[in-house]
């Protein structure tokens, strides 16, 4: 599974509207909601602060908000990017400063998806995998056997 190691901020401009995507790693719904509220306070003068987050090893918890944009044109496209990229334990807020030109529903969907991708590109993503740490005591003769065993494809 892929997770955000360090968050970032990406920005795009579409027909004079400015879209700022802020990305942060989160571990719980409470942490995601707190981050969304912090970002809304930071960009209090923006027209919209749309959000999406995914939490859980199997992406069990997903939420999104259009924050006043037409239904399914902001939060859901942002969430779709996170799900398609198989990224979890992440929250994204895309802030929109309206530039005076209406984008239409298709334009909004593309803009919010592009902004989310820009935010992810500005973040550091890592592959997280389960593992265990082992402490093995052996003599020098056993070292070669262990190296062979751990070098096998399915261990």
Label each PLM-derived region with a short phrase.
Residues 44-46, 86, 151-155:
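Short secondary-structure junctions
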């Amino acid at each position: 599974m892929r997770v955000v190691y360090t968050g970032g901020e990406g920005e795009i401009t579409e027909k004079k509207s400015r879209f700022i995507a802020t990305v942060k790693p989160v571990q719980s719904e409470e942490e995601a909601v707190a981050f969304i509220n912090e970002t809304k306070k930071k960009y209090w003068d923006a027209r919209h602060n749309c959000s999406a987050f995914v939490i859980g090893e199997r992406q069990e918890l997903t939420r999104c908000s259009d924050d006043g944009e037409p239904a399914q044109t902001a939060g859901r496209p942002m969430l779709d990017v996170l799900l398609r990229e198989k990224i979890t334990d992440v929250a994204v807020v895309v802030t929109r400063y309206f530039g005076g030109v209406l984008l239409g529903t298709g334009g909004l969907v593309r803009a919010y998806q592009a902004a989310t991708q820009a935010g992810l590109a500005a973040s550091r993503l890592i592959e997280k995998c389960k593992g265990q740490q082992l402490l093995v005591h052996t003599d020098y003769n056993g070292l070669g056997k262990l190296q062979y065993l751990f070098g096998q494809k399915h261990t």
